[in-house]
Amino acid sequence: MSTTSESILQKRIKRFKSIKRGYYSLLLIIFLYIISLLGPLWINNKPLVLKYDNKYYFPAIIDLLDFIPGINYPLYESKTFNQKSNKIEVDFRQLKKEISKEDNGNFILMPIYPYHPHEDLKDQLDEEYEDLNGNQVYDFGEPFIDENRDGKWNENHPPTLPAGFRGRHLLGTDNTGRDVFVRIVDGYKISITFAIIVTVLSYIIGIAIGACLGYFAGKLDLFGVRLMEIFSAVPFLFTLMILASFMQPNVLLLATMSVLLQGWIGITYYIRGEFFREKAKDYVSAAVSMGTSPSNIMFKHILPNSLTPVITFAPFSIIGNIFTLVSLDFLGYGLRPPTSSWGNLLSQAAENLDNWHMLIFPIIVLTLTIFMITFISEAIREAFDPKIYSRLR
């Protein structure tokens, strides 16, 4: 009977899974991120499937590919669907009502939550009412959905309070009439995407530079450390704000600036120190004596033994990057409206403190996200603790 021993990495992964709080937090973060990436399929003002005059359209599915550059997205004009409107683009929610009244073979399937993160609903926020006498005007006594709960039927009244599952907007709308729930979900996608991009790029650059400085040392290390000291002295957030004020930043541009300005420095210091420690050990001397190339020694021998500190640091880096984006957006130097972001929601809330829902819900989601990432970092730190699986005791 043969037995296979587990590697240290397998033991660490097994240990991480045994820490339920961190493991389930990781699963939940990943699940919510996937759900947010698939947002166009369930939070969108465009239909999943539309059959009109024996032609089929799939607008929401096309929206799912909006991150691919170079794709020409079709404009669905109101006249194509015989919709009388002063707007060029068709109102699919209104089209659904029109199709439901007809019996001509047309068909439309809207997403579960039919609102778009960038959609301005200010001219569509009339509280719904039951037009009993069919005069197209609200008359006293007709039943209505009291979204702002003031006991009166209202027109065009953003921001609206949360209507729960009884009304149209689960968490209400902001001061521009955009749905808060939709913008929180889209903001989650943008925040996590930004944090992941910055963290991954910072790690790639930091590991490469730190490995070279720690392994080759000498004048290269002296020059590299002086360069890092110069970059460290630069006020990161203020510099980013100045650069952002001269351009129209998107997620990728902001992430790139964050990495180049300071994101790579902390990882470089960690890896440099680990390489200094590891290259003095016998297995490195043995590899050198066997004629192994420096690149193989650095990235196949030393690097795998140097990653523990930076792996445990990764979740904290993600938290820091999320707060960087939130801070920039809150101050007005980040992503430009109508792009959804938690910082932009909080900035709107600061101007509308009497509308509690605009402040409470983004803060709750941001806090829960930070807590879950913190649980993940604690679990990783405990699972990758070198004392647990050390052979030298």
Which residues make up each language-model segment?
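Gly/Trp-centered helix-boundary motif
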Residues: 1-203, 207, 212, 338, ...
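Alpha-helical transmembrane segments of integral membrane proteins
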Residues: 173-393
